[in-house]
A protein has these predicted regions:
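Catalytic core of pol beta-like nucleotidyltransferases
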Residues: 1-24, 33-38, 49-106
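Glycine-rich beta-strand-to-loop/alpha-helix junction loops that act as flexible
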Residues: 28-30
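Short hydrophobic/aromatic beta-strand micro-patches
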Residues: 45-47
C-alpha cells in the first residue's frame, strides 16, 4: 500500500468515525496483498454496529467518504455479528478478508 493510499484511507476512516459507529475498517484485495496494478481499485470492508438497513448504511458511507476519495473503491459492509459468523464458518471472501486483510482501524 502506498503512502497516498494510506493517507486517503486515514482521512476516510476519521470522517467515518465522526459520523457512524464503526468497529473495524479492513483493506483487502490487491492493494492489501501487495500486488496492485496502476489502475487497481481500493477494496474496503467496513464492520459496524449500526442498526440501519445495509443499503442505507452504504449510501451514508459513500456520502461521508466522497470528499476524500481519489481512487475507485469497492466497499463491503457488515455488522459485527454477521462478519464474525461468515469469516469463521465459510471459505468465502469474509474468511480471506479476516485472514489476509490489512486492519486500518479497530
Amino acid at each position: 500500500m502506498t503512502n497516498e493510499i494510506r493517507n486517503e484511507l486515514q482521512l476516510m476512516t476519521n470522517a467515518l468515525r465522526d459520523k457512524i459507529q464503526i468497529e473495524k475498517v479492513i483493506l483487502f484485495g490487491s492493494q492489501a496483498y501487495g500486488n496492485p496494478k496502476e489502475d487497481s481499485d481500493i477494496d474496503l470492508c467496513i464492520i459496524t454496529e449500526e442498526n440501519k438497513r445495509k443499503i442505507e448504511l452504504i449510501r451514508e458511507i459513500r456520502r461521508i467518504i466522497k470528499p476524500y476519495k481519489t481512487h475507485s473503491m469497492d466497499i463491503l459492509v457488515y455488522n459485527l455479528k454477521e462478519f464474525s459468523e461468515k469469516s469463521n464458518n465459510f471459505a468465502g471472501i469474509e474468511k480471506t478478508i479476516n485472514e489476509k486483510g490489512v486492519l486500518i482501524y479497530g
